[in-house]
Amino acid sequence: MPRSRFAELSRAELAILVPELLLIGQLIDRSGMAWCIASFGREEMLQIAIEEWAGCSPIYTRRMQKALHYEGDDIITIFKGLQFDIGAPPQFMDFRYTVHDRWHGEFHLDHCGALLDVEPMGPDYVKGMCHDIEDPTFDATAVATNARAQVRPIHRPPRLPADRQPHCAWTVIIDPSYPEAQPIPALAVIAKTIAANWELAPIDPDDDGVADYTGPLLSDVDFGAFSHAALVRIADEVCLQMHLLNLSFVLAVNKRAGDDTDLATSICTKALTGIAGVAAERIRRALALPADLDGLATVLRLHPLLNPAGYVVADIEPGRLSVQPSPAHDDGAWIALCGNSSPAALQAIATAVDPHLHVRITGTETDWTAEFERTEFALKESVEVQVTKVSRGAAFEFQSRRSLPLTAV
């Protein structure tokens, strides 16, 4: 089992990086859906989003439960899972939880970054996200824990009045009389991918710090309390969440594109390019990395495009990235959209570190080397990255918070 690339970071650095990775995962849709609207229209974009999340979230939810040893079938398990879900990154999607008992709970969002992103687009887009997408995808997430869980709105946008707080509120109830929620067909397809079944190193229980989430549900996760080993595992799991979301996105896009494989590849490459650049910028800024070839090498080692190690086989050094045929290629994951004929995503990463860094790729589509060189000519930020930065999440800043227990052990 290859050593995680995240293991090179200190515990303090990992505590900074993990919430960044969760937020980056949320921004994947900000990158991809604009191109889906342009090609298929708003209604099909909504269906792509539903299939994308419902096709993968039960898989990665169960993976994180197993990794942090909080597997169960109750409300507390559902809420813990949301705290490590790229669909609900901390603070940007500010979930506040209330547990009445094991089978009854509520949550509301004091701040919904996704809502603030779509409100300027008008009520149709708000309803599309907060009704059409949320209804099936909330239940899909809950079904990973208990198929008889139902997530239902108390109130939700469009907001009346326009400044209503909290942004939305929901009940979560598990009742044996409820019909079992049914998975969508895409879930069975994604469950067979290499990413879904990728094995990561177990967390060393003797490492200094918290090794699991077996204790009470916390109001806010204190990532700094986790051990180095736990944070490494969480970071790799979050990267797998992103790969699974993308694989589900690719499946949904291919379904609409049909025989037009060039269209599907174009949409998915644009989506990758946008999130690749934004992710690189956030990683560099969060860890205060230098804007040079050394900083770029570190960004590449930590970038979700190239993680977990082993799933993507790569050698990284200042000025050079070499990629070999990988399990991720077999899945058709992000790395399959990079290579000799497709430098856009790697250039977006380099530009985010320093606009003067230019990339040149040689080799085949699965076995290639990218060389980075600093020149006097500064490249402009790509349109794909600019589109992704329409989201407030691209510039969102995390705040320090106290972590308080909400439930007894």
Per-range role (PLM):
Residues 139-140:
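Gly/Pro-enriched, hydrophobic low-complexity segments
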